[in-house]
Amino acid sequence: MEKFQHILFFIFLLVQSPLVMCTTKSTIPVVKIGSLLWDQTEMTIADVKIFAATIAFISLAEKNGGGLSYEAGFVKKPGWTWKTPYGVIASDQEPAVHLNQKEAELICRHFGKRLPSDEEWTSAAYLEQRDNPPSGYIKLKRYQYPGGDSPRNSQCLSGCGDYKGLAPIGALNRGAGHVAAGTTLPGVNGLLDMGGNVWEWTSTERNGGFITRGASWWYGPERQQESDIESKSGDIAVVYIGFRCVTDALR
């Protein structure tokens, strides 16, 4: 009982603090964009394992026996969790899904980071801010897709890059699932998978939920555009929703 109380107190401290600087180091490389350090990829299973081992974390999807997928309405998929997104053991480099918005924020805080706001997300995803961007990108140009002028850098339902999703054959009624973090080519500002792969939670509230950005493997490239503003209930944990973390750059 005493151990359980200590765990609850630790979680309380994480939630209350605006930004908790922990000694735990993330395995995800970061990219500096303006005044923020961005995780270059979406949150991975590897990093959630680090977090989970520290505080004996059990996600809501795990407690409920599985997360959700969409099949003419949301349905619970037994055994589908952040560790097993399609019901089978996954690679550590796959994006962590089946985590709700509050869980995503808690995980970011464990690494001394946070979820980005919608404004921060769109600025990093569409506005090229590097002083000397590589060929194909122009400083201060606002792009149609997070990958640039086209969605070819992304994993989506169709019309994007030539990538093979990792869902087992027959697991899904639509699409082929996500690819591992770091599989696709860098896009605007050198970030990966801001468009497609999995939706990403933000900290911005809208219509009783939270804005998610970037679309996922479930949709075509049209949903990756900045004008597509989607919000979802903060307590939902779905196979195609993940997240990435940011922190303020040290000056």
Give, region by region, the residue ranges found by the protein language model.
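Extended beta-strand/loop cores of jelly-roll/beta-sandwich
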Residues: 2-7, 11-119, 124-128, 229-251
